Amino acid sequence: MKNLGFGMMRLPVLSGPTDFDYAQLNRMVDAFLDAGYTYFDTSFVYHNGKSEEATRKALVERHPRESFTVATKFPTFMLIPEEKIEETFQRQLDNLGVDYIDYYLLHNIQNVYYDGYDGKGGIVKTTHLFDHAKKWKEEGKIRHLGISFHSSAKLLDRVLTEHPEIEFVQIALNPIDWDSELVQAGPCYEVIRRHGRKVVIMEAVKGGGLAKLPENAEAVLKAVHPDWSIASWSVRFCLEKEDVIAVLSGMSTPEQVLDNTKTANSAEPLTDEEKKALAEAMRLYRESAPIPQSEIERYKGLVYHGVPVSAILQAWSICQIQPDPGFSDDNNYLKNAIAEAEHVDFRKGLEKQTVVTADGTDITELVEKAVAWLTAHSF
């Protein structure tokens, strides 16, 4: 199965985020389709709300409807009142220029929007969002209903239990997030499969963060496969996962399209030697962060407002070595972890808690710094 997906969130532009370079984008879309791939993923909010329109112009208006599948998402986090939900969905159909959407997702389902800060029900429940989506499916306006998810495996298990209508879940998954304490990509993936649902993988190269590694980490990978791009290791890691509809890549250049389609066309399950090399490269990557993973291990067992301190520091530290630290997927998880643990709204401030290690070292200031940064950059 050809399961590479084109993420329409980092499209080529000429000046600003909505001034698309259609000459280049059209070539990229054509090359992707020519390689045998059909899944295009957009959203109501990408590129300042213009990604769906760009998808229409570069894809829908230029290719037969049966030659591609399109996915887009309802902007849960915009807190749209229920009386505006139907209007918003119709705008998405119009933006895309289609009569139906192949894969429709409720965007960014997480603790705050699902349960609310108080645990009594977030925007998803108060606006009956799933009921609207089920109606659209019954009307034939969407073919498959799913969610994108940014929270704990525990919450995901409950959401899938409470909503059997969910057919697939989109999660951040890559070699770093797989065993991230906060992102929990591995546990979330296993929850989805245990429920018999399908998976869409986003952030396969962690927003470009795994396309270039520290020199010593790259050397480990190049020693095994000198001809593989660094990014392709992460893509291969994702492509070998089972029950996956699409592995998304937010591509910006024709070269990235060529590299990703070439990788997907030739991808085989990683060998034991390749897995060992990738694991070592990721270890070196974590060690290059401001707080090396070996140091973070010292903080296991410590908790700050119900969240493991090691998870907080790991997420903050990894964000700092991303190409765009303020837009890393890790940023979106802390507020949900705190809300899930204590039903506290981090936006109103957190009560003072002291964090002291077993040897008596006070690391409260370090933890507060990490929490403040992750809070400021949450979305």
For each feature predicted by the language model, list its residue ranges.
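N-terminal binding-site loop/beta-alpha segment at the start of enzyme catalytic domains
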Residues: M1-F68, H132, I363-F379
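Glycine/proline-rich, positively charged
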Residues: P12, F20-A23, D30, L79-V183, ...
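Structured C-terminal cap/extension of enzyme domains
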Residues: L33, Y37-T38, P187-F379
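Hydrophobic residues in well-ordered beta-strands that form the structural core
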Residues: D41-T42, T72, I201
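Short beta->alpha linker loops
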Residues: Y46, K50, H150-S151, S252
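Short, electropositive alpha-helical surface patch
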Residues: A54-S67, D157-V169, D259-A267
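Structural motif corresponding to the early beta-alpha repeats
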Residues: R62-E82, H107-Q110
